[in-house]
Amino acid sequence: VTADAPAGRDARDVARRLDEVADALRSHNIEAIVVGDGEEARAIVLGLIPEGAEVHSGKSKTLEDTGLYTELVESGRYEALRPRMAAMDRATQGREIRKLSAAPDFMLGSVAAITADGTLV
């Protein structure tokens, strides 16, 4: 969750609300980290994924906008599964595709929305 907001009182209100939503997520056993912007989020996520890890990602505007998807696919530091699976023949390699997508080391994606009570939409 990023805290991009106008300065002043509005920024404090946004920060307070983000902290409340993060607490609600935690109450559902979902780890939540509030960050200042997409670059900070990108750095944190990349810091959590060790080099060489298998990483699968869903289609995500957030991953694209933060540069995470490009980093995962093009840096050579990770084994990006999405492009690998896209290049496979579903008719002859369907079982292997399912196995790869079922248990990657890391799965990244995004949600459409998060409600104030910590529900993912």
Predicted regions and their residues:
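The feature marks the mature, well-folded catalytic cores of soluble enzymes
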Residues: 1-121
